[in-house]
C-alpha cells in the first residue's frame, strides 16, 4: 500500500471516530411486548396451539372432530355423540344406583359389553404413543423414544406467559406452606365414606411403587428409565443385579428366612441389596426386598412378605407340573403369573372398590382383542402427582389393643415378625382410612408430601386444574364455590388464587368436593381411571400373543391368574385366614368374611 493512500485514509478514519454513534431504536416503554397467544389456551377440544411470529397462532384441529379457528365448531358426528353422551355425573349416578338392576346386568352378556365400552372409552383418553415430556412441549422423537422422562398429557405452561397459569390469576402463586396449612392440614380425622380401610392404603402404596420411580438425580420430570407399568419390580428388583441378589437360584424361588416358624424376606446379610433404613439398624434386622424404601412402613413390608410367599408357593406348583423345567423358566413363568394375579386383583377388587359402581368390573383381556389397542404404556407425570393419596393415612395405627404413633410405626423393624402376617392383615383391615378429597385431611406427619408435589408441579409448570378438566372431557368450573360446594374454603381459595382458572392441578384434585359416598371428587375418577385402565390392560400379558395358558405354564398357572383374589392371596400364604378386605367389617358391600383353614404351603 502506497504512502499516499495511507495519508488519504487516516483523515477518514479520524472523522469516523469523532462522529457520534448511530441512534439506538428503543422499544417504547409504554407499549408492552406482545403476549404469547398460546398463553390464553385458545385451542379447544384437544386442538394444538402453534405460535407464529410474535402474536399470531394457529390451532391444529386434525382428528379432533372440530374445526374453526379455535377448534370449536363440531362436525356432525361429533355433535351427535356429544348430544347423546350422558354427563360424567349422570353416568356415575347410574352406575352407583339401582342395585337390583345391576344384579341382573352382571349376570348377563351386557356386563361384558359395558366393560369393553368402559375400557375403550377411558383408554382412548390417553395418547399412545406418548406426546410430550418435561423438556419438549411439542411432538418430538425424544418424547417418544426417551423413557427416562415421564410423559405429559398436556404441555407445560409457556415460559413467557404473564402469570404462572397462563394469563389468569395472580402474578405469583400462593405460598405452598400457607396453602397446605390452611386447606390441606387435617383438623380432625375424616374417614372414607365407603368403609375404606388401612389395608387398602398400604396395598395402594405398595402397588404404585413399582411404576412411580422418580429419579432423584435427574429431577422430578425424570424416571429411572425402567418399567412403565405393572412389572413387579417392587418384588423382584428394578435391575437384573438386584434381582439376582434376591433370587435363590433353586426351583425358581426367591430367598427367604424363617422366623418363629414363618417365612419372611431375607435380611440384607443374606441378600446383599441396598435398603433405606435409619443409621443404627443392624443388617440382620433389615429385610431385603425389591423396593429399597419398603422398610419405612410395616404395611409395605407386610405385602412384600405376602408376595414373596406367593411367588415361592406358585413355584412349587409349577415344579410339580413341570419337573423338567430349570430354575430360570420356573422363575420367569411365576413372575408372569404374579403379574396376572396383580392385575386381576387391581381391576376386580381395588378399582371396583374405588369406583363404588354396582357394575361388576371384569378382568378379561379378550374383550379387547377385536379393538384397536396398543399394548404398551408410559407413566405420565400427571398420573404420578394424582396418585399421592396420603389423606388415607390415619392419625395413628391400631394393632390389637396397642396404638402406635407415627414415631413408633415408621421403620418399626420388629412389628411384622412380632405380630405375624395374619394379625397385621386383620388389624389393618379393621381400621378406617381417611377420605382423600374434599380438603383438610392430611395428617401433619405426611403434609410435607403434598407440599413437595405442589413444588414439583410448579417446577414442571403444569397447566391449571380447569385445563386438565377440559382435556378429560369435563366442564371447567366457573367459580370456587361451585368447585368446593361450600363458601368458607371457596373464599380462602379466591383470596389465594384470585381466579378459578388459576387453581393448580394437585390442589384441585385434593380440594374438589367429593361425590356422594366417594373418597374423592369427579375429577380424580375421570382423570385417574383412564391412566389406570390403559396401564393395566396395556400390559404385554394382556395381548393376544401372551394371553394363553402356555404363557403361564399351562392350565394350572392360567387358572391361578383367572381365579386370583385378595383373600386367596393372603389365605393361601398363612396358616389361618384372617379377616381380609378393602372395607372394614360390617360395612355395606363387605365381602371379607373369615374362613379358617390351614395353609397347605407353610
Swiss-Prot record:
**Does this UniProt record's set of keywords contain Metal-binding?**
yes
Q: Which residues bind heme b?
A: 390
Q: Tell me, what is an example of a GO biological process annotation in this record?
A: regulation of cell population proliferation
- Principal location class: membrane
Q: How is its activity regulated?
A: The cyclooxygenase activity is inhibited by nonsteroidal anti-inflammatory drugs (NSAIDs) including ibuprofen, flurbiprofen, ketoprofen, naproxen, flurbiprofen, anirolac, fenclofenac and diclofenac.
PANTHER family listed in its UniProt record: PROSTAGLANDIN G/H SYNTHASE, PROSTAGLANDIN G_H SYNTHASE 1
What name goes with this protein?
Answer: Prostaglandin G/H synthase 1
The species is Rattus norvegicus
Task: Cite the source lineage.
Answer: Eukaryota, Metazoa, Chordata, Craniata, Vertebrata
Amino acid at each position: 500500500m502506497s504512502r499516499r493512500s495511507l495519508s488519504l485514509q487516516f483523515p477518514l478514519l479520524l472523522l469516523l471516530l469523532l462522529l457520534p454513534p448511530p441512534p439506538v431504536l428503543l422499544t417504547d416503554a409504554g407499549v408492552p411486548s406482545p403476549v404469547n397467544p398460546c398463553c390464553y389456551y385458545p385451542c379447544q377440544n384437544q386442538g394444538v396451539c402453534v405460535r407464529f411470529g410474535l402474536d399470531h397462532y394457529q390451532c391444529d384441529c386434525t382428528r379432533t372432530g372440530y374445526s374453526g379457528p379455535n377448534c370449536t365448531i363440531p362436525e356432525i358426528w361429533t355433535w351427535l355423540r356429544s348430544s347423546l353422551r350422558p354427563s360424567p355425573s349422570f353416568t356415575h349416578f347410574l352406575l352407583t344406583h339401582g342395585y337390583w338392576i345391576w344384579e341382573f346386568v352382571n349376570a348377563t352378556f351386557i356386563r361384558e359389553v359395558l366393560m369393553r365400552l368402559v375400557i375403550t372409552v377411558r383408554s382412548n383418553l390417553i395418547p399412545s404413543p406418548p406426546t410430550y415430556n418435561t423438556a419438549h412441549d411439542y411432538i418430538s422423537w425424544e418424547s417418544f423414544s426417551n423413557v427416562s422422562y415421564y410423559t405429559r398429557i398436556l404441555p407445560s405452561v409457556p415460559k413467557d406467559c404473564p402469570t404462572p397459569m397462563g394469563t389468569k390469576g395472580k402474578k405469583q402463586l400462593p405460598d405452598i406452606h400457607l396453602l397446605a396449612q390452611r386447606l390441606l392440614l387435617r383438623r380432625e380425622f375424616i374417614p372414607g365414606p365407603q368403609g375404606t380401610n388401612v389395608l387398602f392404603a398400604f396395598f395402594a402404596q405398595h402397588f404404585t411403587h413399582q411404576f412411580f420411580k422418580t429419579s432423584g438425580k435427574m429431577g422430578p420430570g425424570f424416571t429411572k428409565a425402567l418399567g412403565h407399568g405393572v412389572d413387579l419390580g417392587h418384588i423382584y428388583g428394578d435391575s437384573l443385579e438386584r434381582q439376582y441378589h434376591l433370587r435363590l437360584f433353586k426351583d425358581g424361588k426367591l430367598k427367604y428366612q424363617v422366623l418363629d416358624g414363618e417365612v419372611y424376606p431375607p435380611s440384607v446379610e443374606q441378600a446383599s441389596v441396598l435398603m433405606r433404613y435409619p443409621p443404627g439398624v443392624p443388617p440382620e434386622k433389615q429385610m431385603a426386598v425389591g423396593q429399597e424404601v419398603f422398610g419405612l412402613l410395616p404395611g409395605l413390608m407386610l405385602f412384600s412378605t405376602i408376595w414373596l410367599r406367593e411367588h415361592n408357593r406358585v413355584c412349587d406348583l409349577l415344579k410339580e407340573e413341570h419337573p423338567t423345567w430349570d430354575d430360570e423358566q420356573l422363575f420367569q413363568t411365576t413372575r408372569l403369573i404374579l403379574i396376572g394375579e396383580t392385575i386381576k386383583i387391581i381391576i376386580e377388587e381395588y378399582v371396583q372398590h374405588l369406583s363404588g359402581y354396582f357394575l361388576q368390573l371384569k378382568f378379561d383381556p379378550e374383550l379387547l382383542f377385536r379393538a384397536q389397542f396398543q399394548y404398551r404404556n408410559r407413566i405420565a407425570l400427571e398420573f404420578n402427582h394424582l396418585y399421592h393419596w396420603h389423606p388415607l393415612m390415619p392419625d395413628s395405627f391400631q394393632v390389637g389393643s396397642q396404638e402406635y404413633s407415627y414415631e413408633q410405626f415408621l421403620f418399626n423393624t420388629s412389628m411384622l415378625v412380632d405380630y405375624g402376617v395374619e394379625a397385621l392383615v386383620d388389624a389393618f383391615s379393621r381400621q378406617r382410612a381417611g377420605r382423600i378429597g374434599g380438603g383438610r385431611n392430611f395428617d401433619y406427619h405426611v403434609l410435607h408430601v403434598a407440599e413437595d408435589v405442589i413444588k414439583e408441579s410448579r417446577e414442571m409448570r403444569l397447566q391449571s386444574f380447569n385445563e386438565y378438566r377440559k382435556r378429560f372431557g369435563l366442564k371447567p368450573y366457573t367459580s370456587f364455590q361451585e368447585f368446593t360446594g361450600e363458601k368458607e374454603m371457596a373464599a380462602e381459595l379466591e383470596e389465594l388464587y384470585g381466579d378459578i382458572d388459576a387453581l393448580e392441578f394437585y390442589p384441585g384434585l385434593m380440594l374438589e368436593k367429593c361425590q356422594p359416598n366417594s373418597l374423592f371428587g369427579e375429577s380424580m375418577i375421570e382423570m385417574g381411571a383412564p391412566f389406570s385402565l390403559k396401564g393395566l390392560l396395556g400390559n404385554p400379558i394382556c395381548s393376544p400373543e401372551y394371553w394363553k395358558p402356555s404363557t403361564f405354564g399351562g392350565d394350572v398357572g392360567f387358572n391361578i391368574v383367572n381365579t386370583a383374589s385378595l383373600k386367596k392371596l393372603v389365605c393361601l400364604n398363612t396358616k389361618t385366614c384372617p379377616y381380609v378386605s378393602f372395607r372394614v367389617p360390617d360395612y355395606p358391600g363387605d365381602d371379607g368374611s373369615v374362613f379358617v383353614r390351614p395353609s397347605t404351603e407353610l
